[in-house]
Amino acid sequence: ADEDVVLFLRPTAPFRKPEEINHVAEMLLNQKNADSVRSVIRTKYHPRKSYLWSEATLVRYTSDHAANAPSQGLEPVCSAVGFIDAVRWRVLRDGHDMEGVIIKPWLAPQDRALDLDTEDDWQHAEDLATQHGWGPGRIGEPSNPY
């Protein structure tokens, strides 16, 4: 059915809570015009202050480059983190990308929205889990059964 939702729960972002997964799915189901919901965090470095590294030179990343503008005057931006993402089945079925055209944001918890790519990332995740008493089925506060 067109209402079917596909959830992406990447193993490189392990610190999700069941209620967060349900919330993201419900967000998409309740927003009929949305194609997907992406988990995002606020971006620390604004893309309008960024450059592409091209051999020995820097190339402005955007056409409206603002490297010297005060950050607080720039529009807020976010980055996709792959913590919990949801997309309507029809978007995938019809050969679109994995998000479609109308993408709704879900602000992921920055302290748990890790991306485990390197050994250092894994060590950081293990340290967090040990520090907070997290384990399989026990994410969040140590007293939380989830």
Language-model features: locations:
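Short histidine/acidic/glycine/proline-rich micro-motifs that form metal-
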Residues: 11-15, 112-113
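Short acidic donor-binding loop at the edge of a beta-strand
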Residues: 1-7
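Conserved core of the sugar-phosphate nucleotidyltransferase
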Residues: 5, 14-108
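Secondary-structure transition/hinge residues
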Residues: 1, 29-32, 133, 137
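Conserved alpha/beta core of the MobA/IspD/sugar-nucleotide pyrophosphorylase nucleotidyltransferase superfamily
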Residues: 76-146
